Amino acid sequence: MSTLFTYDAPTMQQEESEEEPRTSIFAGALVTVSLIFINVVVYVVIALAGVSPISPAGQQLAPWGANFGPLTMHGQWWRLVTACFLHFGIIHLAFNMYILFQVGLYSERLFGEMRYLLLYLLAGVGGNIAGLYFHPDTVSAGASGAIFGLYGGLLAFLLMQRDAIPKEGAHALIKYALIFIVYNLVFGLTRPETDITAHIGGLLTGFLCGCVLSAPLSTDSLGHRSLHLGRILVVAVGGTALAIVAVEKLPKRDAHKDEWLRAVMVSPRLTVGQNDVLVYAGSATKSDAQKLAPALVKVGLLNKPGVLLVLTRDNNGAALLIPFKGDETAQATEAKLSAPGSSLSGLPLAHTTLPWEDPALLRSLAYVGPQLTAALGTTPLTLRLLNSKGEKHAEIRIDAVAAAPGRN
């Protein structure tokens, strides 16, 4: 992709300074170069830490600060920023940094360092919030939202400062920006792994911020520089406040589902038997998992390759989260727990019965529960039955001597 950033336009910083214009390609590009450097360093650090350098899974990036609804909306708001500096592999990073270098060099000269950095960060945050609205359960990362915001800011500048550069150069920039935006939006629609909503959110945020940051100020006003700094402060505070409100207005989420997703995504795990996994979260320890795992194998809860259970603990006791394939509309499940007294590896549930609605399954779990409590060495232990989405449908409370099955 060829660059159009060859015209040395007057900048908003030059309106405030009598410095001689610089001719180096990196002149006035301190922030752009710094952003690229930070992105590359982050990529190298996480790659050296074991994250796949080619195509990392979301589960690898989530612990490093990627945007993920169950974590971001659970108090880890900083992910709205850190996600802008993480990428899904070297190709993702290289493409974004190439585009950032092109649009960044010119945008930074137009807006100046402080306005440019503010525009970049707010656009990135705005894009990530948009992603949370539409794809809250998807791990997302990348500088694309912020970069789209720079294009939005560039268009806003050309709208608000129509005489800043010659019309020929302005028309070329508009054409270039629109081609980039349309092409990447259409391309993104053909790739399900692309978070197109974050791109659009960043674009709109960048345009709105750009309109405010590039609005002309009277050159004969007293305290001209103070007005510029005041405008930056207003946009920074206002943008942060709007981001907080936007996050607060996000749809309320199922607490049990988020507990499951958080545990699966970022908590440590213990591999058991034939590739079964026991995740331990909350205040549960590896020692807890090691004590419970043999009992889970013995009663048949961990006896099939690919099973994943979650052990969590808090002040109210321990809980074992048990997911079943299928949801409320399913006609069949993979559950194979049988009646009390058997090997718990035999009779499948009826095809028309969902696991959390099957009395025999609830009785079976209640029967084996005390064995799990004894192995774990704590009481109470709550068995929570989840669907494949992590939504709770039933739970059984196990104490030291009895089990009381129940639904909620």
Residue ranges and their predicted role:
Residues 344-356, 370-406:
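A short amphipathic beta-strand at an alpha->beta junction
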